[in-house]
Amino acid sequence: MQTVRMTTAQALVKFLNQQYVEFDGKQQKFVKGIFTIFGHGNVVGLGQALEEDAGELEVYQGRNEQGMANAAMAFAKQKHRKQIMACTSSVGPGSANMITSAATASANNIPVLLLPGDVFATRQPDPVLQQIEQTHDLSISTNDAFRAVSKYWDRINRPEQLMTAMIQAMRVLTNPADTGAVTICLPQDVQGEAWDFPSYFFQKRVHRIERRLPTKASLADAVEMIKRKKKPVMICGGGVRYAEAAEELKQFAETFHIPFGETQAGKSAIESSHPYNLGGIGVTGNVAANTIAKEADLVIGIGTRFTDFTTASKQLFQNEEVEFLNINISEFHANKLDALKVIADAKEALLALIDELQEIDYQSSYTVEIADAKDAWETELSRLHNIRFTCQDFTPEVEGHFDENLNEYVDALGTQLTQTAVIGQINTLLDEDAIIVGAAGSLPGDLQRMWASRKPNTYHMEYGYSCMGYEVAGALGAKLAEPSKEVYAMVGDGSYQMLHSELVTSLQENKKINVLLFDNSGFGCINNLQMGNGMGSFGTEFRYRNQETRKLDGAIMKIDFAASAAGYGVKTYHVTSLEQLQEALIDAKKQTVSTLIDIKVLPKTMTNGYESWWHVGVAEVSKNQSVQAAYESKVSNLQQARSY
């Protein structure tokens, strides 16, 4: 047997260079590159291996471990899970910073390979710098926290363990049914230890992502269910994008006259203008999709996890005869809502159903309902685009909270811009193939409802974990995946302040991204939630501490985000009017470096809900009558929802 004597870290790098995926006959490298932040826990081990021979891996320098791992996830998401980035950090705080990103990737079923440094396997120098000592178990380190948020976790305590660990890692990373974060912990001493690795460990490995076919029995059951139903509705989930099944879904909708709503992950699989595309569905959905969904007698979920935002906490579907048909590559997700399961690739399942349903000449019973619903939403959308603030007699979209305070925000932020009007203008002015990236706050709701996707795969929303701080890093990841396209991070001031470190990496790599920063001086989405459930405004506006009350109810904070970003070398713009916004967007397209447009918008001018409800933990007992009323409303809505 031929062997190669290498360190564990060197063997890992050599192995990663030999991984390929094949999908629909197309073969490509699986691991594009590796994000690094070096510390004592990885620099002389994995760092040495990368310096000596990185192979074809692109080596990137992150600025924050969570940020770089978010960028890696966004890269894989934009690549439809067919290519990934790895990330390496030092031991302790560096690795802990990636835990949130691991959870984000796993919640979204997006493959990311995390390689955190770890404490010494020999324990000789214990406690090593940044080690946590657990007196009940000395084998525990910070990296054990990854177990809860990884789809596969392993620790390499001996060099020879690398082989089985990495083979299992690739199994999970290339498994469309159960992929997510894979964490391989690398004790810092073991990284540098040598072993005689067999040459066959480094052979080219092609991981074929196969399209699972539906069984004849499940297909027959699905046909029997569909032919009994008159008003079905489909839900286009992220699985449609990752399976590249958009054309088949369009064919299915057109052939059988069946409309579909979009989840956050599924949006832009098909252009918004398609006659059967109702748009966003659920809590952050629009009136068209939710109205049709309420009356549907069959819900066909295609590649969706049926989150609470998609089902409106299982209260959206109100037809007493409604049943569920789930097409999913994952048995776990297909099993939800007591559904009839078709465990299969979305494309193959749809093609098979098209053949079977055509044989029986199936057609839904919709007449004008689909067109009427879309027309109603287009009318509402036009209204949202044209909302303008007036100092007197103005009623915001989210009304009754602090309408009387809006003039204070006008003065403090120097703006009269409404969020819906800003989004409308941005949607009009961006290139058709531009990619927008979002994750948290009020923007995901506005964008799922309002954004018109004119080209496929241009809407990139992380809403499985709704991770604040994903947006800027996510934009970098999307840009690395599609460097020829303009990429825009749609981010609120709250999320931007949490994390925007990879904006600097975009400058370093000369990968231009555009940050569209919506500043309403607060956590506006959560302010809406608390006040909508009977509370006052508490801890969600960005106000100075009042020296008299000792509370955060003083003057509104105004931050010049453009000035801050300009210090990095970003091209920046200040926007307080639609005219300035248009000028900034046009000029930003001409730039070759990353840009940031600091857009001051008024709170409460985002969209509100349409025909939906969201179950949150309202206090059952309170001295506040409005909280009591909110709790009673919750109980009433729960009575209309499924129990599971």
Curated annotation (Swiss-Prot):
Mg(2+) binds at D493, N520. Its EC number is 3.7.1.22. One of its GO terms (molecular function) is acetolactate synthase activity. Keywords: Hydrolase, Magnesium, Metal-binding, NAD, Thiamine pyrophosphate. Involved in the cleavage of the C1-C2 bond of 3D-(3,5/4)-trihydroxycyclohexane-1,2-dione (THcHDO) to yield 5-deoxy-glucuronate (5DG). Belongs to the TPP enzyme family. This is 3D-(3,5/4)-trihydroxycyclohexane-1,2-dione hydrolase. It comes from Bacillus cereus (strain AH820). The lineage of its organism: Bacteria, Bacillati, Bacillota, Bacilli, Bacillales.
